[in-house]
Amino acid sequence: MQQALLDHLRVVTEEEQRILDGVAEVDKDLYTSGKDFTVDSAKMLSEGKLIAVRTHTRFVHFPSHRHNYIEVLYVCQGQLTNIIGGKEVVIHAGELLFLNQYTRHEILPAGEEDIAINFMILPEFFDVAYTMAGSNNVLADFLVNVLRQDEERGEYLHFKVAEVLQIQNLLENMIYSLVTGKGDQNRINQTTMGLIFLYLLESVQYAEMRLPNQYENMITMT
């Protein structure tokens, strides 16, 4: 990742500064209006937007929660430790974690040099990616089930693709586009996500796909 972009993402946010100043927990009002800790797309995405990004909040334990949108977590530098179904899932630099709307997870405190991006995505954003990836393969079918299912079952996918240069370049392009906010690039970003899906299909040997309540791989492909 370009140093200038990484430096931009490393800047301490107002929320993080309050934590450093002594606020010991996440301010849930920034994320949800309800009693149940479900992060709300209405608070995270501007009206009419299908996708947005924000840096993961460091220096604090992020308590168990889920989202009413799709979350894709990408670690730019360092690592991030999630707890899903009682199991530690460590995401290292260059890796991706897809979480559907029903997956509850908590995140252990990240340090200053642990830089992660949360992609907050409404399901319809993936329509172009579905078209590009097709449906005649196991991974594409699994992605469809994870990302668009009506059944309230938490699932996640962990892609260890730090060495796949094409995926890293595409992710950097999309992060830059969303961070700078230059123009309405929904279509470009949807197509970029479609290309990422295509490369993920070529990289299934690096994928771990699990149900949070199971400790074994749900499916293994090489």
Predicted regions and their residues:
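Amphipathic, well-ordered alpha-helical segments in soluble domains
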Residues: 71, 166-173, 192, 199
